[in-house]
Amino acid sequence: MSEVTFPEGFLWGGALAANQSEGSYLAGGKGLTTVDMIPHGEHRMPVKLGLEPRFTLRDDEYYPSHDAIDFYRRYKDDIALMAEMGFTVFRTSIAWSRIYPKGDELTPNPEGIAFYRSLFEECQKYGITPLVTLCHFDVPMHLVTEYGSWRNRKMIEFFARYARTCFDAFNGLVKYWLTFNEINILLHSPFSGAGLVFGSEDNREQVKYQAAHHELVASALVTKIAHEIDPENQVGCMLAGGNFYPWSCNPEDVWAAMEKDRENLFFIDVQARGAYPSYAARVFREKGIEIEWQDGDAELLRHTVDFVSFSYYASRCASADMNEKNSSAANVVKSLTNPHIPRSAWGWGIDPLGLRITMNMMYDRYQKPLFLVENGLGARDEIDANGEIHDDYRISYLKQHIQAMGEAIADGIPVMGYTTWGCIDLVAASTGEMSKRYGFVYVDRDDHGNGSLARTRKKSFWWYKKVIASNGCDLSE
C-alpha cells in the first residue's frame, strides 16, 4: 500500500443526524416526524418497512428519537468537543418539522430557524464548516397522514418551500447541502426512508418508484433554487453506498451483482447525470411500473448535483439465487454473507478495499467530486475501572478505511472530505440501540433510555485528533 497523502484543504470531521441526536422531539414548536413513530424492539423493523402502519404513539413502547442524546440542549458542549478534535467539517441535518411543524404551512417556525442559526454560528465560531442534509429519514407525520408522503406530487412544492427557507435563513453560514440522506433506502425501508405506508391493494414497486420520481424532481428543483439564491452553494446527493460483488464468476452471478448495483445507483444516475438511465425502461416494464411525469420534469432533472456524497460501511454480495445462499440480515439492503471478509458484532462486513472499489466505480460513472459522509464501526464499548474506553477495534477499522480512501485519491479521484458516522454516540437508525456505538465520544445512555447522558472521550478521540492534525499522514495507533 502506498503512502497516504490527502490534498490541502481536505475536510475532516464527523456526522450526526437530527433525528438520532437532538431529542426534544416536541420542543421549540417541532412537529412529529416519521422517525418519532418508530419504536425500539420487535416492532421496529415492520414499522420501518411500512408493513405495520403507525399514526399514533403508544404508551407501552419506548421511542429512542424522543430524547436521543439531547444534542438539542447540549450542542454547544458537543461542538466544543468536535473543535477539540480539530474538525473542519460537521455534517448534520435540519429536522424539517422544526422549520415547518406540519410540513405544509406557508410560514416557518421562528424557533426552529433560531435553533439552527445558533447551531451553525457555533460551528462558525470554531472554524467548522457545516455540511447540512435537508431530509434525513424524518418526514413530518402530517404529510404522511394527510398526503401519503412522497407518493403525492404535492410533496415537491412542500419540500421546495422548506429548502428555500433554509437556503435564505442560513445563507452565509452553510454552503454545502445534501438533499436526501441515503435516497436509495426508499426502496429497502420505505417508511423510514420516505414515509411510505402500503395498503393491501398497492403495487409496492409502483408506489416506491413514483415516490422516488417525486423525490428526484424535488431534489433537482431545490438544487436549482440553491444555485439561484447563492452561486457559492454546493449541493450534493447522498447514496447508501457499497458495491455488490458477484458470489462467483458464474456469469449469472455477475449479472445479478450488476443489477443490484444499478438498483441503488439508479437514483444517483438521475441526480448526477440529469436524466433517467436507459436501463430503467426495461426494469419498469418488467415490474409493471408506469411513472407519471408532468411537463417540465425532464427539464428540471437536468439541474444536476455539484458532488456525489455517500455512506460506506461494508461491501455487499449477490447471486442469481439469493435464497439458496447464506443471506445476511445485518442491514436493510439484502446481501449474501461474503466468506472472504471479517464481520462486526452486528454482522456487517469489514472491507476497506471495497471502499476503494466503490469510489472508483462511482467516479468512473459520474466524473464528479466525491464526499464520504458516513463511515464507521458500530460496536459495544466497555468502560474500564479507570473510567476509560479503549476502542482499538474502532481505530483499526477507521485507519484501514482512511488508507483505502487515500488510495482512491491516489487513483485520481477528487475527494472533498470525510465525516465519520456518529462522531458522538447516537441512536442507531437500524436497530434503535445506543449500545451499537460509533463515536469518539461515549454517551452514558442505554438501549432503554437510562443514563446521565454524560460525555466521555474514548481512546479513538485522541487518535482522530492526531489524524486530523497531520491531514491524514499520521495514522499510527
Language-model region placement:
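Active-site region of glycoside hydrolase catalytic domains
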Residues: 2-59, 83, 102-104, 113-477
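Active-site mouth loops of central-metabolism enzymes
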Residues: 60-74, 151-153
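Catalytic domains of carbohydrate-active enzymes, especially glycoside hydrolases
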Residues: 74-95, 303-307
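A short acidic, glycine/proline-enriched capping/turn motif at secondary-structure boundaries
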Residues: 88, 97-99, 137-139
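Glycine-rich, proline-tolerant flexible connector loops at the mouths of alpha/beta enzymes
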Residues: 94-108
